[in-house]
Amino acid sequence: MTLIPPTDHKFAALHGAVWSGGSFVYVPKGVKLDFPLQSYFRLNAKGAGQFEHTLIIVEDDASLHFIEGCSAPKYNVANLHAGAVELFVGKRASLRYSTIENWSKNMYNLNTKRAVVQEGGA
């Protein structure tokens, strides 16, 4: 957790203590993917939490389109989603990151998402 240290806030600390699973994508220098990559996370338990971690590294002169989805069934009790996303974009690299979420009114969604983009990156 480089961009989101557990000392950042209490939900980052909770995430850092219990996260399991997530996505890791590494795009080497000069590689340009011409199709989107996707991941999907579903919370399937009442009164539970979801703490996935997404780490994406796109090196210099590379490109990626990444789509992430999260959802849960409608429950009559509260649930917590406290995921974390860290994005690193190299020089002249391109990252198009999208999130699609479908939560019920009983879901507390407290994601933390951060990015570092180097010169000429987008």
Give the residues covered by each predicted segment.
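Conserved beta-strand/loop scaffold segments within soluble protein domains that form the structured core
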Residues: 1-122
